[in-house]
């Protein structure tokens, strides 16, 4: 029986840590959907949903990762039902992530009328500290992004910082 996994997030921007979780999910499940939460407050997001999809698609193609990208809004549990998701994939970096993710999981289980499981994948050691917020902070201060984000994301972030300074 085919297992469909969903890895949801804002991916603003997508980091090497996100890509690592996606790659590992593809190795575990038959079908993997990367679910991008539709921006409800575009003024805070660095990238539009379309830009996020494009950046992720470029990475998937370059690295030959077989996953789908879908943008959704509304409740995650509704998207899970719509896509017939069996497994919700969440990445964990630290104990504080676990506490948040456990609340998130229990809330989704309470709201859901369908059966799905949540799988937590530990961040790889080199990405334990990595977050999109940290990457944006580094970019705003003109730091080196190479070890945190793929090249295409780095280029777009540098361009965004230039636009912000105009």
Predicted regions and their residues:
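Nucleotidyltransferase catalytic core that binds NTPs
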Residues: 1-166
